[in-house]
Amino acid sequence: MKAYQREFIEFALEKEVLKFGEFTLKSGRKSPYFFNAGLFNTGRDLARLGRFYAAALADSGIEFDVLFGPAYKGIPIATTTAVALADHHDIDTPYCFNRKEAKNHGEGGNLVGSALEGRIMLVDDVITAGTAIRESMEIIKANGADLAGVLVAIDRQEKGKGELSAIQEVERDFGCAVISIVSLGDLITYLEEKGNATEHLEAVKAYRAEYGI
């Protein structure tokens, strides 16, 4: 695990974005941890969050032309990632996001920001069912662009309804890499390193044994 990944886990715990306990997911599964990126909700939080997304992008080596943030949660993520890439990596990246409702006045259309062209890096908080990615792919294709990859904050590394995870299904269906700042495996490594979270560690390991990919 790299330093920025460890720092991201500590940041998420500090802001209570990442919690350990018992949580019922939409799927009905009882999960020993929960991640709610909506709690990164101040200017300083967003600035720090962007640095982690930018670090993961730089680490991935994936080449892309435009950052795309799907409405709504992806919008501030794309914005802060673009700022962090410029400030910390000297990469001036165009960014774009969509509106849920197309405008019929002013500049019109359902896209805001840069033109959606070339190789697109989609940024979002998590992938659960992959629905937002599929909707975004329709927008990307309609603009004649290609999906270079997808970056999310956390990869839960768990099966969906079949044997694959939602992320693996996206990789299979769209032929692109899906990367994350951290994964479930990184959380387990972090808990093992801490040495004082045995209860949480055992619960997360048991969850991975049952639902992990």
From Swiss-Prot:
Entry binding sites for orotate: 34-35, 128, 156
Catalytic reactions of this protein: orotidine 5'-phosphate + diphosphate = orotate + 5-phospho-alpha-D-ribose 1-diphosphate
Pfam families, alphabetized: Pribosyltran
Keywords attached to this entry: Glycosyltransferase, Magnesium, Pyrimidine biosynthesis, Transferase
CC per GO annotation: cytoplasm
Domain of life: Bacteria
Gene Ontology MF terms in the entry: magnesium ion binding; orotate phosphoribosyltransferase activity
InterPro entries documented for this protein: OPRT, Or_phspho_trans_dom, PRibTrfase_dom, PRTase-like
GO biological process, one term: 'de novo' pyrimidine nucleobase biosynthetic process
Pathway info: Pyrimidine metabolism; UMP biosynthesis via de novo pathway; UMP from orotate: step 1/2
Positions of 5-phospho-alpha-D-ribose 1-diphosphate binding: 26, 72-73, 99-100, 103, 105, 124-132
EC number(s) stated in the UniProt entry for this protein: 2.4.2.10
Cofactor(s) for this UniProt protein: Mg(2+)
Main EC class the enzyme belongs to: transferase
Reported function: Catalyzes the transfer of a ribosyl phosphate group from 5-phosphoribose 1-diphosphate to orotate, leading to the formation of orotidine monophosphate (OMP).
Similarity field: Belongs to the purine/pyrimidine phosphoribosyltransferase family. PyrE subfamily.
HAMAP family according to UniProt: PyrE
Quaternary structure (record): Homodimer.
NCBIfam families hit by this protein: pyrE (TIGR00336)
Stated name of the protein: Orotate phosphoribosyltransferase
Organism per entry: Vibrio parahaemolyticus serotype O3:K6 (strain RIMD 2210633)
Protein's gene: pyrE
